[in-house]
Each structure stands twice: as structure tokens, then as C-alpha cells.
Amino acid sequence: MTELQIAAQRALRLMDLTTLNDNDTDEKVIALCHQAKSPAGDTAAVCIYPRFIPIARKTLREQGTPDVRIATVTNFPHGNDDIEIALVETRAAIAYGADEVDVVFPYRALMAGNEQVGFDLVKACKEACAAANVLLKVIIETGELKDAALIRKASEISIKAGADFIKTSTGKVPVNATLESAELMMSVIRDMGVAKRVGFKPAGGVRTAEDAAQYLALADRLLGEGWADSRHFRFGASSLLASLLQTLGYDAKGTGSSY
């Protein structure tokens, strides 16, 4: 295998194969679950809206891939600062059967100078998730924060409040994952000494095997080779899968999403 193919194989097993579109249907989610069982191996997870969790669970079980995890989103995509609503949505996602919850950090509140509400919101959602053995990823929306100091601060607050992962983006704003924001966020994980318990997820804009290889190389450099396993690293993507399969010599269609 070439270096790119090795990276593509790694990346495929780290994918949160995603559809978060307003026109999602049961049929589209079923098709996504079928794609998660790829000829080159299973993706780590599918990421879908909460109402589709039951049909995804049924599909994954019936196709013999019960270990593919189901991630969903809460406080999404706007990252409002109403803790109670974020908590109610997170509890509902858990009740639907989510294995993982990706909650949006109240990033606009942080930009306005309020650090406390972000901590309190993540902490409340973490307590709900921990009680159900559900993984919590916190989306800090780096493309809106823009400023390196704010990206670092949002990462630090999320980690201190209990995040299991910090994630770049919703995929719903003009600027999503970038290597620059990834380096900032993984550097925080390294500098806080939490690499054993906290992972990183770039999302939105990671579309090719070459893109994925760059993120994995960055993770290897900052946090050590072997750190970026499925407990510590995910790609939030949809169209990436087709590129990975093509790189690995398989013919496959993408999901057609821009995520």
C-alpha cells in the first residue's frame, strides 16, 4: 500500500459518516447506514438527527454492523446559550438510544465575553451523558470564533467541563475544519495533559483522502503516532468516504452531501 492508501484505510475507520440535512428521511439514513458497511471496512459511527436513531439502530443491527456507533447532535446548529434546552435535547437524544452526542458550545456567548455559560452547559450535558455511558463531543465552531485565543479558550472550557472530544464545526457555517484550527485544538489537548481521555474531531470540509492524511499526520506529530484511534479521533464527513474508497481501489458513490 502507498502512504496515502495507508492513511485512507486509517481514516475510513475513524469516520463519523454524516447526514445532517433538513431533507433527511428514513430512506436516506438507511442508505447512510449501508454505506457505513464499506468494502474496505466499517466506519466508526454514523452521525444523524435524533429522530432517526431508531431506524439507524435497526438497520445497523440487521446488516451485521452493530458495533458502528450512532452519534447525534444537540443545541445544533446555532449553539444557543440556553442550558436547559441543550440539556433537554441531550437527554432526549440519550433516550432515543444515542451512543454519542455532539453538542454545540455557546460560542457566541463566549465571543461576547461570557465564559461561564459554556462551562455550565457542557458540564450539564456531560453529567447526563456520563450517567448513560454516552460519549460527549463538544462543537466549538472554530470558523465563527476565528480568533486563535478564542479557539483555545473554548477548547479549554469544554475540556474542563468534561468533554470527551472537542470538535471543530457544525458544517453549517462558511468556514469549517481547517488544519490551523486543528493544530490549535490538538495543542490544547496536549498542553493540558488530557490526551488519554480527550479526543479531537475535525468536521466539515474534509473531502479527500489527501485532506484526511494531512489531519492524521498533524495528530501523529502533535500527540504521537498511535494516538489517533477511534476513541481519540474522528472525521465528521460524508463525501470523504467516496474519496477514501477510490484511493483504496473501490468504486463507490458519495452521499451527495456537502458536509
From Swiss-Prot:
Principal subcellular localization: cytoplasm
Pfam families: DeoC (PF01791)
GO molecular function: deoxyribose-phosphate aldolase activity
Uppermost EC category: lyase
Residues annotated as catalytic: D102 (proton donor/acceptor), K167 (schiff-base intermediate with acetaldehyde), K201 (proton donor/acceptor)
The EC number(s) this enzyme carries: 4.1.2.4
Alphabetized InterPro entries for the sequence: Aldolase_TIM (IPR013785), DeoC (IPR011343), DeoC/FbaB/LacD_aldolase (IPR002915), DeoC_typeII (IPR023649)
Record GO biological process: 2-deoxyribose 1-phosphate catabolic process; carbohydrate catabolic process; deoxyribonucleotide catabolic process
Catalytic activity line of the entry: 2-deoxy-D-ribose 5-phosphate = D-glyceraldehyde 3-phosphate + acetaldehyde
GO cellular component, one term: cytoplasm
Keyword line: Cytoplasm, Lyase, Schiff base
Subcellular location: Cytoplasm
Pathway annotation: Carbohydrate degradation; 2-deoxy-D-ribose 1-phosphate degradation; D-glyceraldehyde 3-phosphate and acetaldehyde from 2-deoxy-alpha-D-ribose 1-phosphate: step 2/2
Function field: Catalyzes a reversible aldol reaction between acetaldehyde and D-glyceraldehyde 3-phosphate to generate 2-deoxy-D-ribose 5-phosphate.
Family assignment from sequence similarity: Belongs to the DeoC/FbaB aldolase family. DeoC type 2 subfamily.
Full protein name: Deoxyribose-phosphate aldolase
Record organism: Edwardsiella ictaluri (strain 93-146)
Encoding gene (name): deoC
